[in-house]
Regions:
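Long hydrophobic segments that form regular secondary structure
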Residues: 266-273, 277, 352, 360-363, ...
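Conserved nucleotide-binding/hydrolysis micro-motifs of P-loop NTPases
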Residues: 14, 30, 78-79, 102-105, ...
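Charged, surface-exposed alpha-helical interface/stalk elements
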Residues: 519-594
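P-loop NTPase catalytic nucleotide-binding module
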Residues: 1-14, 32-33, 102-253, 268, ...
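Active-site phosphate-binding and catalytic loops of NTP-dependent enzymes
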Residues: 30-37, 41-58, 150-156, 207-208, ...
Length: 594
């Protein structure tokens, strides 16, 4: 049986979880059709998800259709949980992008579509809620072609949901990537050729089939299920080779911790030793997507227990693989968290294990912690989970924008034995690096000049100290070079280097100087042409730098670089300035000096 790892993605309230529930029910995987409103869906397993009616964490469920075993990955729709979506996208064979026939193409829909396209994920579009009052048909198809991709092919009728034969309109789309279809215009259209090309081009993410239906009533779902079978590529479980997989989630079940991974090649079973970037370990449990102990083959989803060092993003079978670059913007807010209750650090560390971008770190007051956030909904969810799962009543400060520090120039400092209380010599040079290069560390001093434990103590301390620069923000994009070392055996201990290194680094940073940089967003705004002047005024008022607007008939588009801290203000003002017809898509655009 071939395997398909299928993601379901959408903007919030498009009906994504309802579609997941319908696919599971119609395939016989569940006996009862749950509902989001009823709080009894299979993939929204957390009490908090059921109460709020939103998906917070990606969840995996399994069903069988024809000769396919489908691992269905339901992802969050709210933009505050976009990190969950990003982790899931990297392990998919195909995706269903859900749109609401009532709300239409939303800004987050466009962000998701753009990301799926950049990853080359074969994608089916499902227009949900076709039975609702206010549902749009032809006009929505026009919006899909204009805002998402012109390379779409409707596969059933939006009016009666009957199958649509592949005719001239489909051939015109398929001919863009097929000389055979182009030739068929002369020789006469061959439906079998068109179907073969639809399958091929869907699998290569060149075209995007569109299905209409209703997850609640089940209308159009049979056609969608057949499209999943016919059009989306599958993984071959017989794929041989060395173990290769990616950890995309951390779960806790029955008091045990599991790393959830998708395998791309090889096999994995209990007691196998697994190598990854930060070490290796032996799996004491290997469960399949249905929580049964099994041997997992290529294409499968494995829940791996017993290896505490496994983290999200780790590549199984490789000790050298580097993480994939982020495709969604990082969190640009942070808040200080305090609590009178014990267990704050343990609770937040647990949540950060599931979502590393929370990035828990020490706060300004004793016992306080700082967390990174995407928005208010995520803050509310973290507070609720701390209270319900760990008995911790946490208070959050007002979120502030996360800035960073970049070096102005090169700085160098040396402190030798005898000059301080520490029996050690350390010299460090710090210099600006390339944008997005992170913190790099290298040796100029001879590697054998210090025992390995002392070398490790220096590097670890450098990286930890750069988390808080001279102006209170993280220092980024720099190269740190260890230039001088010295010790006195047997008096010197690792603590001498851990205590001396921050002093040397502080002096080097003071000589280099730093500049505070704020996060920026590239905002693309679509609006009626008559709203251009007021929107431009808004962008300038919020510190943005707009480009020349592009006007096409009665609509217009403008791109601007704006501070992340003002983005929410722009989003809130836009509907009033455009009579509800303005849409904004933002992507992280790096950092800019204040």
């Amino acid at each position: 049986m071939r395997m398909l790892n299928l993601g379901v993605v959408a903007h919030v309230d498009a009906g994504k979880t309802s579609l997941t529930e319908r696919l599971l029910f119609d395939s016989g995987a569940i006996a009862h059709l749950g509902s989001v409103d009823g709080g009894d869906t299979r993939t929204d397993a957390m009490d908090l998800e059921r109460r709020r009616g939103i998906t917070i964490r990606s969840a995996v469920a399994t069903f069988t259709v024809a000769d396919r075993k489908v691992h269905l990955i339901d992802t969050p729709g709210h933009t505050d949980f976009v990190a969950e979506v990003e982790r899931a996208l990297g392990v998919l064979d195909g995706a269903i992008l859900v749109l609401s026939a009532v709300e239409g193409v939303q800004p987050h829909t466009r962000v998701l579509m753009r990301t799926l396209q950049s990853l080359g994920v074969p994608t089916i579009l499902f227009v949900n809620k076709i039975d609702r009052r206010g549902a749009r048909h032809t006009g929505l198809l026009h919006d899909i072609r204009r805002m998402l991709s012109p390379m779409v092919i409707p596969c059933n009728s939006p009016d009666d949901l009957a199958p649509m034969p592949l005719g001239v309109p489909a051939a015109e789309v398929l001919a863009e990537h097929s000389d055979a279809v182009l030739q068929s215009y002369v020789d006469g259209l061959d439906p079998r050729l068109l179907h073969r090309e639809l399958v091929r081009q869907t699998g290569e993410a060149l075209v995007y089939p569109v299905f209409f239906g209703s997850a609640i009533t089940g209308a159009g779902i049979d056609a969608l299920r057949q499209g999943i079978v016919d059009l989306l590529p599958t993984a071959d479980p017989a794929s041989s080779g060395e173990l290769d997989g990616t950890v995309f989630a951390i779960e806790y079940s029955g008091g045990r911790r599991f790393a959830v991974a998708r395998l791309f090649s090889g096999t994995l079973k209990v007691r196998d030793r697994i190598t990854f970037a930060s070490g290796s370990g032996r799996a004491t449990a290997v469960l399949d997507a249905d929580y049964r102990e099994a041997t997992i083959r290529a294409g499968g989803i494995a829940r791996i227990g017993g290896i505490s060092g496994l983290r999200i993003g780790d590549r199984l079978g490789s000790a050298t693989a580097t993480p994939e670059p982020a495709r969604f913007r990082p969190p640009t807010l942070e808040a200080v968290v305090t609590s009178p209750d014990e267990g704050l650090y343990a609770g937040l560390s647990h949540l950060a294990d599931e979502d590393p971008l929370i990035n828990v770190r020490p706060g300004p007051q004793p016992g306080s912690l700082i967390v990174s956030l995407y928005g208010e909904v995520q803050r509310e969810v973290i507070a609720a989970r701390l209270a319900e799962e760990f008995g911790v009543k946490a208070e959050f400060s007002a979120p502030q924008v996360v800035c960073v520090e970049r070096l102005k120039r090169t700085g160098h400092a040396v402190k030798r034995m005898g000059e301080t209380l520490f029996v050690a010599t350390v010299g460090l040079r710090i210099e600006p690096g390339e944008v997005d290069s992170g913190v790099r560390y290298q040796l100029e001093a001879e590697r054998g000049s210090l025992p390995a434990a002392f070398m490790t103590a220096i590097e670890d301390t450098v990286r930890a100290a750069l988390a808080t620069g001279p102006q209170g923000w993280r220092v980024v994009d720099c190269l740190v070079t260890l230039t001088h070392t010295g010790y006195s055996s047997p008096v010197t201990v690792a603590a001498d280097f851990r205590n001396l290194t921050p002093l040397v680094l502080k002096e080097a940073l003071e000589k280099a100087g730093t500049v505070v940089c704020q996060p920026m967003e590239q905002a693309d705004i679509d609006m009626p042409a008559d709203a251009v002047s007021t929107v431009l005024n808004l962008l300038v008022r919020c510190g943005g730098a707009p480009e020349m607007p592009v006007v096409r008939g009665d609509s217009a588009t403008v791109r601007a670089i704006v501070p992340s801290g003002r983005l929410r203000e722009i989003e809130q003002a836009l509907p009033g300035l455009t009579n509800g017809h303005g849409t904004l898509i933002a992507r992280f655009a790096g950092y800019q000096a204040l």
